Structures are given as C-alpha cells and as structure tokens.
C-alpha cells in the first residue's frame, strides 16, 4: 500500500508552499533542484516545515486543498509553530466525512 504525504515548505522569500507526494525526500530534492512546482522555482531554496502521512491519496489531496484555501497565513503559521498540523488535518477529514454522510 502506498503512503501519501501532505507537506508544507517555507520558500526563501518566507512564503509557504503546500503539496502532496508519495516520496517526500525525492519531492523536496526536486523542489530544491529547480525542477519542482512553478511557484517554488523562483523561491529557492525551500525548507520542509511539516509533513503528515496518509494511507490514501484522496486524504492527502483534501488536506492540501484545505490548507491552501481555507486558512490564512497567520493560521497556517500558528498550526506549524504549535505542531498542530496533523491534529487539524484529522479534524478536517472527520468533519468532511460527517458532512458527506449527511448529504447522502
């Protein structure tokens, strides 16, 4: 079974980048080689701030989307600083699952 990671990088200009992958070390190296995401290419080097592993791709992608679209920078930095990323991702997935059950 594959393992998936949602990861958060800090770019050289102090901005944050969030993505998902199956190989965290390789993806970080790809970003830092300038062959990663378009966003990070001009903001090298990047540094890994946090990562959370998941058993399935959908959960990793959902948490990436939530981090990018539902949190403001201050919230993102607070979760990272207080080591609450995994806890909040799990809460988000549980809430998402409850909503899906009620919609069916």
From Swiss-Prot:
SUPFAM superfamilies, alphabetically? GIY-YIG endonuclease
- Which parts of the chain are coiled coil? none
Q: Where is the GIY-YIG domain?
A: 2-79
State the superkingdom: Bacteria
Q: Which InterPro entries match?
A: GIY-YIG_endonuc, GIY-YIG_endonuc_sf, UPF0213_domain
- Which family does this protein fall into? Belongs to the UPF0213 family.
Q: What is this protein called?
A: UPF0213 protein YsiG
Q: Which organism is it from?
A: Lactococcus lactis subsp. lactis (strain IL1403)
């Amino acid at each position: 079974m594959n393992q998936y990671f949602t990861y958060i990088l800090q770019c050289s200009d102090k901005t944050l980048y969030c993505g998902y992958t199956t190989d965290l070390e390789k993806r970080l190296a790809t970003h830092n080689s300038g062959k990663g995401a378009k966003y990070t290419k001009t903001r090298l080097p990047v540094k890994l701030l946090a990562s959370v592993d998941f058993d399935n791709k959908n959960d990793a992608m959902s948490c990436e989307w939530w981090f990018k679209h539902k949190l403001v920078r201050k919230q993102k930095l607070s979760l990272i600083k207080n080591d609450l990323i995994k806890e909040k991702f799990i809460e988000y997935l549980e809430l998402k699952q409850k909503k899906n059950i009620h919609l069916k």
